[in-house]
Amino acid sequence: MSEKDSYMVFSGTSTRSLAEKICQSLGCELGQLVITKFSDGEFAVSYEESIRGRDIFLVQSTFPNSDNLMELLLMIDAAKRASARTINAVIPYFGWARQDRKDKPRVSIGAKLVADLLSVAGIDRLITMDLHADQIQGFFDVPVDHLYASGVILPYLQSLKLDDLVIASPDVGGSKRANTYAKYLGCPLVLCNKTRARANVVSSMQIIGDVKDKNVVIIDDMVDTAGTITKAADIMKEAGAKTVRACASHCVMSGPASERVQNSSLEEIVFTDSIPYSNRCAKVKQISVADMFAETIRRVINNESISSQYLV
């Protein structure tokens, strides 16, 4: 069996465009999979070609969370029952990752539950990108290949050739990620210290560092309602920043996010295509991570190291 015959790539409904680009990069066809939806809201998964003895790669971001997660679980179960040799879940955006610990009494740890569900369903490996918390890798008993969007975002930032560049973190929790970018680009780091009134609502924010006459790039792992990142951009502009941009791995962009970004001080906000973005906001740009995932899949198939893919 040749290398191309040894593996197959399939996609759920949430990330089909990215899966097609991954297959184009790999030089293979996207596998035939039918998802039948019923009037009561249930759905069934069926592989339309033999996958017996093959290494299967299932591409599916779990956003919006519940239906796409259930769809992925059924894809895994069907592959296991169809005698696939290995089942590799390729989850560019891992939903529920913000529920990685008990931050108050009597709450669930959603990320651990999702990890357990995927494991019980039958995955042999997880390939994902920029988990909200790195320690989620430890929730799995199977190998986890954790990729970083810096592999495509850093080259983009370098192409802008911005002088007086400053990297910013929108909160203290993201300082490690932002500091990695700052070190690679050889520029200063500034932080924002925020206080939340409740979930998705920022009550106050202060800048720690100098942004006057600087070109600021805010780095984050995801943008949800865009309240934090747009508030940070507006405050930095008021503090004298020349320009403010933002880069984030995952384009959740729910609720009022698009309107907030459009009306903010941001020059642009750059995401990967881990989540498709359909709203039209002139300030939103997406960079594909298809080649990065394709190369990872190729290396997994050939039992090669993937560490050389990481810029930082």
What residue spans do the PLM features occupy?
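PRPP-associated nucleotide enzymes
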Residues: 1-312
